[in-house]
């Protein structure tokens, strides 16, 4: 079994392998059994990370003109929705050359702006290269091979992934740039954000609606924003703005809870609490600038949550939220080198929308 570990906050976490590695391994094993017979229990492949990995082979099916087998997706300690699913490859002999197809459970790209052309199976460029390299090393020079990748549970699993948001229908994507799944990978999440921004821009969305998570998305929908314009950016608002600026997007809407929004008002564009937590300081500062009594400022400063502050302040100091929203708008404009104008919508769980700046 493949074993590779990374250190994350002092914890030893096990890596896994990508759906791309699974597809390449299954394709290589099926091709070898098709041309040279026998039944393999495991197969070794090269991955872009620069190492070899050996993975178990299962569900072997030998037909008159094909061999089909699978690799079980292993995600290590990463909380990956695809962990444990079977990635199948079917190898068939053809007269010459190489052909790659997507079967049941592999998504089909239905929009522009992704790594794969519209109408093609959602098998990303690096996995495509991996599959071709591994199988063509085995196929005799005067022969050819057709590979079909399929994922029986792919359509069901895809509903819980980014694919519906990316206009990929019918299944999951075969992904991976290194061949390895790194637990809690920040890079993987940021890549998903960038991909969604680019895809939506290519499909005609020129004013994206950025939200931090599902709660913000639900609020934005209730306010009448178009769901197709929404992009979940998690803690990476700064990174998302960088991608928007690269695409020369001039206007966005940002809908978020006061807790996250206060951090941006103070210039924090990575909003994870471990990186930045100035929520109460932000509200307290604005209250002080409004000449609120010291005991009010001090009480808010020492509170644990922004929801508690909203409840405590009631409506008497509601101007504070407008001031914070205006600062967020200004911060975004400055952060993007005076290129992106933002509509700001800030809400609390208790009161709903507490500030809106166009």
Curated annotation (Swiss-Prot):
It catalyses: Co-precorrin-5B + S-adenosyl-L-methionine = Co-precorrin-6A + S-adenosyl-L-homocysteine. Its EC number is 2.1.1.195. It holds the Pfam family CbiD. Keywords: Cobalamin biosynthesis, Methyltransferase, S-adenosyl-L-methionine, Transferase. HAMAP family: CbiD. NCBIfam families: cbiD (TIGR00312). The keyword Methyltransferase applies. GO terms for biological process: anaerobic cobalamin biosynthetic process; methylation. Gene3D superfamilies: CbiD-like. It comes from the Bacteria. It comes from Clostridium novyi (strain NT). Belongs to the CbiD family. InterPro entries: CbiD (IPR002748), CbiD_sf (IPR036074). GO terms for molecular function: cobalt-precorrin-5B C1-methyltransferase activity. SUPFAM superfamilies: CbiD-like. Pathway: Cofactor biosynthesis; adenosylcobalamin biosynthesis; cob(II)yrinate a,c-diamide from sirohydrochlorin (anaerobic route): step 6/10. This is Cobalt-precorrin-5B C(1)-methyltransferase.
């Amino acid at each position: 079994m493949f074993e590779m570990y990374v250190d994350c906050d002092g914890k030893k976490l096990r890596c896994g392998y990508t759906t791309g590695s699974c597809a390449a391994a299954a394709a290589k094993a099926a091709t070898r059994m098709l041309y040279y017979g026998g039944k393999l229990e495991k197969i070794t492949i090269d991955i872009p990370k620069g190492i070899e990995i050996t993975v178990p082979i299962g569900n072997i099916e030998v037909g008159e003109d094909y061999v089909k087998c699978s690799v079980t997706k292993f995600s290590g300690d990463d909380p990956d929705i695809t962990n444990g699913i079977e990635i199948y490859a079917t190898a068939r002999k053809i007269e010459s050359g190489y052909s790659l197809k997507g079967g049941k459970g592999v998504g089909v790209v239905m929009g522009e702006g992704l790594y794969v052309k519209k109408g093609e199976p959602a098998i990303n460029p690096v996995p495509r290269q991996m599959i071709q390299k591994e199988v063509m090393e085995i196929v005799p020079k005067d022969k050819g091979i057709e590979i079909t990748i399929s994922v029986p549970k792919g359509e069901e699993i895809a509903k819980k992934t980014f694919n519906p948001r990316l206009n990929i229908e019918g299944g999951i994507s075969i992904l991976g740039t290194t061949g390895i799944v790194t637990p809690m990978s920040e890079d993987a999440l940021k890549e998903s954000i960038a991909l969604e921004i680019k895809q939506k821009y290519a499909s005609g969305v020129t004013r994206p609606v950025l939200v931090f998570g599902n709660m913000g998305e639900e609020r934005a929908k209730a306010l009448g924003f178009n769901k197709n314009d929404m992009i979940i950016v998690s803690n990476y608002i700064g990174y998302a703005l960088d991608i928007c600026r690269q695409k020369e997007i001039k206007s966005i809407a940002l809908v978020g809870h006061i807790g996250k929004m206060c951090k941006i008002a103070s210039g924090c564009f990575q909003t994870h609490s471990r990186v930045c937590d100035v929520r109460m300081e932000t509200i307290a500062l604005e209250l002080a600038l409004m000449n609120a009594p010291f005991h009010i400022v001090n009480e808010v400063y020492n509170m644990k949550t922004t929801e508690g502050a909203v409840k405590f302040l009631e409506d008497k100091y509601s101007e504070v939220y407008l001031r914070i929203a205006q600062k967020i708008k200004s911060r975004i404009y400055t952060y993007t080198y005076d290129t992106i104008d933002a509509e700001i919508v800030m809400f609390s769980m208790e009161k709903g929308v507490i500030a809106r700046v166009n």
